[in-house]
Design a protein with these regions (language model features):
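Short, positively charged and aromatic/hydrophobic N-terminal segments
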Residues: 23, 28-31
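Cys/His-rich Zn2+-binding cysteine-cluster or related metal-binding knuckle/ribbon modules and their
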Residues: 33-40, 48, 58-123, 236
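Basic, flexible Lys/Arg- and Gly-enriched helix-loop patches that mediate nucleic-acid binding at interfaces
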Residues: 89-92, 103-105, 132-134, 138-161
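Conserved phosphate-handling catalytic cores of large alpha/beta enzymes
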Residues: 196-200, 211-236
Length: 236
C-alpha cells in the first residue's frame, strides 16, 4: 500500500466565489486594489444587492464617504429600522407599517374586490397605474413544481377563507402570463368555483412569458380595464 497521499486541489478551490458576477465584474474584481479593508468590505456588501456590480458598489461607497457622518448614520439606521420593524398585512400580506396595511384600511377602496398578485412588487406596479380601486391579496409566489413551490407554500388557503368571510364580489387575477401563473389561476379557480364570486383576469396586453412588474403603466392599466372572465382567458 502506498503510504504517500497527495491532495491535488481542484481549480475551483483556488478561486474566489464569483457566482452571479458578470465577466466584466469578474475581471474588475481580479484587478481592483483596495487601499482599505473597511472600504473593500463595504463594497462587497453593496455588490450583493441585485443589479449592483463592483463598479457601481464602489461608486456608492465613495459617495457615502463624501457625506456627513450624520447623514450616513441616518441612512444605515433607516435601512436597519425598515428591516426590523416592517410588517406584513394580516389581511392581504402586503408590506405595512401596522398590522393592517393602508390599502386594506382605506374605506374609500372597494373592499369587495380583490386583486390577486404574486408579490409586493406587483402591488406597487398596479398602484402606480391608479386604475384599480379594490384591495389586494399577495400570494407570495406562484405554483411551480420544478422550483419546489406548491400550493401549501403560498397564501392560497388564506385567500379562500377571506373570500368566504368577506363575501367577495369579484376576484381579479393579475399574475404573470406564463405556465406557472396559469397553473396558479386554474388551481385557485377550482378551489372557489362553488362560491358566488365573479372571477376575472387582466387582459393579455403583456406578452406571454413576461413578468407583470416589468410592464409599463399604460399597458398594465389597459390590461386591468379590459379584464375578462377567467374561463375565457383559460380557453385561449
Amino acid at each position: 500500500m502506498n503510504k504517500w497521499h497527495f491532495h491535488i486541489p481542484r481549480l475551483s478551490d483556488l478561486l474566489p466565489d464569483v457566482s452571479g458576477l458578470s465577466l466584466n465584474d469578474y475581471r474588475y474584481l481580479c484587478t481592483m486594489q483596495f487601499p482599505s479593508t473597511l472600504l473593500e468590505n463595504a463594497v462587497n456588501e453593496f455588490a450583493k444587492l441585485p443589479g449592483i456590480g463592483k463598479k457601481t458598489a464602489l461608486r456608492m461607497v465613495l459617495h457615502l464617504l463624501k457625506q456627513d457622518i450624520g447623514e450616513v448614520t441616518h441612512f444605515s439606521e433607516t435601512i436597519a429600522k425598515m428591516r426590523s420593524d416592517i410588517k406584513f398585512c394580516q389581511r392581504c400580506y402586503n408590506i405595512s407599517d401596522a398590522d393592517i396595511c393602508s390599502i386594506c384600511a382605506n374605506s374609500m377602496r372597494n373592499q369587495r374586490m380583490i386583486c390577486v398578485v404574486e408579490n409586493i412588487r406587483d402591488v406597487i406596479a398596479i398602484e402606480n397605474t391608479q386604475q384599480f380601486s379594490g384591495t389586494y391579496h399577495v400570494l407570495g409566489g406562484i405554483i411551480s413544481p420544478l422550483d419546489g413551490v406548491g400550493p401549501d407554500q403560498l397564501n392560497i388557503e388564506q385567500l379562500v377563507t377571506r373570500i368566504e368571510k368577506e363575501q367577495t364580489e369579484e376576484l381579479v387575477f393579475a399574475l404573470s402570463p406564463n405556465i406557472q401563473g396559469d397553473t396558479t389561476i386554474y388551481y385557485i379557480q377550482k378551489k372557489i368555483q362553488k362560491l358566488p364570486c365573479k372571477v376575472t383576469t387582466i387582459a393579455r396586453g403583456i406578452a406571454f412569458g413576461g413578468e407583470l412588474e416589468y410592464a409599463d403603466e399604460m399597458t398594465l392599466a389597459r390590461s386591468l380595464a379590459k379584464r375578462l372572465p377567467v374561463e375565457q382567458y383559460m380557453s385561449h
